């Protein structure tokens, strides 16, 4: 059975993508003694499945590391979870910790399946069956606005952490999707859209998403909002 230590039945969910795997694994390692961590691959259906579980009140909290499905929705990739991604949390009073994992890319199948209109873009053959497309500064701006509006509507406590040094394994110096201008477009749009409050906070960190220190920051954010939330519900 699913279990937790000291908090009753707490089911914590995370989103993972290949290029954010080190982050998710590090977070899981730090929390697995206290929570049963359910990891969903952010492939469109993964995000949808997670949100169905949340809507059924089977999840008591979320660490949404990889919001990459939003990039597919905005940029026209094949792994979108649809325009309602994140909407379920507006109806649920559960802790939400999020980040912008892999929003630097949209996804397609094999290279020859990429629509012709994208053939002039920065493309990366992840493997023979997966081609990644770098999101542009304008797309990143739209992603920031999309996520910001959704975060503002969330009912429960929110901490959204931004790793300023890169959003995926291939978004760092010397790698194909390193584009500080595009990343900054996302950050600026999110900051302009997001409404900080006593319950909702945006946190910028001078780290890469796969740094151990960033994983620890996610865990700290989780503990900051999940533990008080659990105590208030059982008091």
Regions found by a protein language model. Name each.
Residues 13, 61-65, 97, 159-161:
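Structural motif
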Residues 1-7, 11:
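Single conserved hydrophobic/aromatic residue that forms the stacking wall/gate
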Residues 23-29, 49-53, 73-77, 108-112, ...:
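Short acidic, glycine/serine/threonine-rich loops at helix termini
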Residues 12-44, 48, 52-55:
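Glycine-rich phosphate/diphosphate-binding loop of Rossmann-like nucleotide-binding domains
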Residues 15-23, 43-45, 67-70, 102-105, ...:
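Gly/Ser/Thr-rich loops at beta-strand to alpha-helix junctions
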Residues 37-40, 45-95:
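A conserved active-site cap/scaffold subdomain adjacent to cofactor or substrate pockets
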Residues 80-84, 88-235:
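C-terminal non-catalytic interaction/assembly regions of soluble proteins
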């Amino acid at each position: 059975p699913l279990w937790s230590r000291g908090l009753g039945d707490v089911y914590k969910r995370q989103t993972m993508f290949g290029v954010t795997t080190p982050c998710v694994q590090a977070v899981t390692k730090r929390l697995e003694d206290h929570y049963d961590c359910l990891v969903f691959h952010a492939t469109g259906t993964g995000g949808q499945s997670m949100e169905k579980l949340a809507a059924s009140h089977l999840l008591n909290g979320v660490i949404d590391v990889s919001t990459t499905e939003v990039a597919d929705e905005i940029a026209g990739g094949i792994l979108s979870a649809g325009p309602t991604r994140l909407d379920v949390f507006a109806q649920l009073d559960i802790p939400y910790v999020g980040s912008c994992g892999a929003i630097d890319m949209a996804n397609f199948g094999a290279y020859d399946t990429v629509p012709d209109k994208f053939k002039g873009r920065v493309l990366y053959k992840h493997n023979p069956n997966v081609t990644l497309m770098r999101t542009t500064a304008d797309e990143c701006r739209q992603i920031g606005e999309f996520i910001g509006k959704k975060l503002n509507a969330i009912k429960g406590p929110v901490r959204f952490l931004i790793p300023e040094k890169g959003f995926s394994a291939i978004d760092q110096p010397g790698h194909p999707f390193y584009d500080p201008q595009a990343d900054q477009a996302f950050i600026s749009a999110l900051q302009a859209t997001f409404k900080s409050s006593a319950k909702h906070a945006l946190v910028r960190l001078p780290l890469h998403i796969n740094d151990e220190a960033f994983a620890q920051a996610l865990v700290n954010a989780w503990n900051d909002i999940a533990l008080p939330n659990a105590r208030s519900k059982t008091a």
